[in-house]
Regions:
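Long, low-complexity, polar/charged, intrinsically disordered or flexibly structured peripheral segments
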Residues: 200-207
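Gram-negative outer-membrane assembly/targeting C-terminal domains
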Residues: 327-348
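Helix N-terminus capping/helix-initiation residues
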Residues: 17, 304, 333-334
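Gly/Pro-enriched, hydrophobic low-complexity segments
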Residues: 1-3, 94-103, 107-177, 207-326
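Generic structural motif
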Residues: 182-183, 264
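Solvent-exposed N-terminal domain segments of exported/luminal and surface proteins
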Residues: 1-119, 126
Length: 348
C-alpha cells in the first residue's frame, strides 16, 4: 500500500468485504496527510437543558494528527521515513484543554503502530500534578477512564466531568482496526449529512438544543458493518463498548453514524456525524482556503439512548473567535506538536 483508497471496488459478496470497507474508512480521503482543528468545543446536555446551560463545556486548544502513510499532498509523499524508522503509522494529539478551569492543561497524545500486535503508545497530561504519564489502551477505550484521568485521578481519582465521548469514538471510530472482528451486514440507503449547510453547526430546536439537526440531510448509500472487540490483554476485562454498528458512506468512506452496545449486549449510545464538502471551513475564511473542495466534520453527537444525555462536538466551535478551525493538509501539524514534552509545556 502506498496511498489512496486501499480497495476501490468492494463486492458485497466478498467474504472479506467488511474488512475492506474498514480499511477504506481507515485510509479515507478526509485527512490524508495532517490536520489541526483549533478550539474544538465539546458540550454535554441532560434532557431539559439548553445550549446556554450545558452540564459541561470543554474547549480544546488543538486537535491534530499526522499520517506517516498514505500521504498525497504535503511532502514527504507518499510515506514519511518515520513509518519504517519508528514503525509509527500516525500520531494524534488533543491539548491543551482550555476549559473548564479545573481541567486547564489536560490533554492526551497517542501513537499508532504499523504492527497490528502493538497497541497504541499514549500519554496523558494531568492538570492536578502537571506531569505527563503513560496511558493504557483501556483508558482510551473508556470515557470514564478518560474523565478519571482528567480529574487528576488515574487509577483511583474521582472523575467528575460529564461526557459521553471516549477517544475511541472520535470521528465515529478511532480505535485500532486490528483490535476488532468485522461482519458485513449489507448496504442501505439512509439519511446522512454530507453537504452540511451550517459551519459552525447549529443546535437542534426540537430537543432544546441537545443535538444537531437543522441540516442538509440527504439519502446516501451506506455500508453497514458490525464491529466486535477482540479479547486482548491490553483492554483488560474488555472495552465498555464491545460491539458497534457502523454506517459508512460508500463514496466518502467516513462514518455517518454508529450504534454502540454495552457489555450486556443492549443498545447504549448512538453517534451521528455531520460533514461538509467545500473549499473552506467557513465562508469568510482567510487562511484555511484549500485548492479544491474537501470533506470535513462540522459536528458529532454522541447520545445515551437510555437516558437522553448527549455530548456534542463542534468544529468549528461557536464561542471562539477562531472560526476557521480546520487546517487540513497544510503542514501545520508538526512532529513537535505530538511530543509529550510539548504537551507538558502547553499546560504550564
Amino acid at each position: 500500500y502506498s496511498a489512496g483508497l486501499p480497495f476501490p471496488l468492494v463486492d458485497a459478496n466478498d467474504p472479506n468485504a467488511a474488512l475492506k470497507v474498514m480499511w477504506n474508512f481507515s485510509y479515507r480521503p478526509l485527512y490524508t496527510d495532517d490536520a489541526i482543528s483549533k478550539n474544538t468545543e465539546i458540550a454535554s446536555y441532560r434532557p431539559g437543558s439548553s445550549p446556554a446551560d450545558p452540564v459541561e463545556h470543554f474547549t480544546i486548544g488543538n486537535v491534530g494528527f499526522y499520517n506517516n502513510i498514505g500521504r498525497t499532498e504535503v511532502n514527504p509523499i507518499p510515506t514519511d521515513p518515520e513509518a519504517t524508522r519508528a514503525n509509527i503509522r500516525y500520531r494524534f494529539g488533543a491539548y491543551p484543554f482550555l476549559e473548564p478551569s479545573e481541567m486547564r492543561g489536560f490533554g492526551f497524545i497517542r501513537y499508532r503502530s504499523i504492527d497490528p500486535k502493538i497497541e497504541d503508545n499514549s500519554w496523558m497530561m494531568s492538570p492536578r500534578t502537571r506531569h505527563t504519564r503513560r496511558a493504557s489502551a483501556s483508558e482510551l477505550a473508556d470515557v470514564f477512564g478518560l474523565l478519571d484521568a482528567a480529574a487528576g485521578g488515574g487509577n483511583g481519582g474521582a472523575g467528575t466531568y460529564a461526557s459521553n465521548l471516549d477517544p475511541d469514538s472520535f470521528f465515529g471510530f478511532a480505535a485500532k482496526i486490528e483490535d476488532f472482528n468485522y461482519r458485513f451486514l449489507g448496504e442501505k440507503p439512509m439519511l446522512a449529512v454530507v453537504h452540511a449547510e451550517n459551519s459552525p453547526a447549529k443546535a437542534c430546536p426540537n430537543d432544546g438544543g441537545r443535538t444537531i439537526c437543522p441540516e442538509n440531510w440527504e439519502m446516501r448509500r451506506l455500508y453497514v458493518i458490525e464491529a466486535d472487540a477482540k479479547q486482548t490483554s491490553a483492554l483488560g476485562s474488555g472495552p465498555t463498548i464491545p460491539k458497534r454498528i457502523f454506517y459508512i458512506d460508500s463514496e466518502g468512506w467516513f462514518i455517518t453514524a454508529s450504534d454502540q452496545y454495552d457489555r450486556d449486549g443492549k443498545l447504549w449510545k448512538t453517534v451521528a456525524t455531520f460533514n461538509a464538502y467545500r473549499d473552506r471551513p467557513i465562508p469568510d475564511a482567510r487562511v484555511a482556503i484549500w485548492p479544491f473542495k474537501r470533506m470535513f466534520q462540522t459536528a458529532l453527537v454522541d447520545e445515551d439512548v437510555t437516558n437522553g444525555f448527549s455530548t456534542v462536538v463542534l468544529s468549528p466551535g461557536v464561542e471562539t473567535e477562531e472560526h476557521e478551525s480546520w487546517y487540513i493538509n497544510m503542514g501545520l501539524a508538526t512532529e513537535n506538536f505530538f511530543n509529550p514534552a510539548s504537551m507538558a509545556n502547553a499546560a504550564h
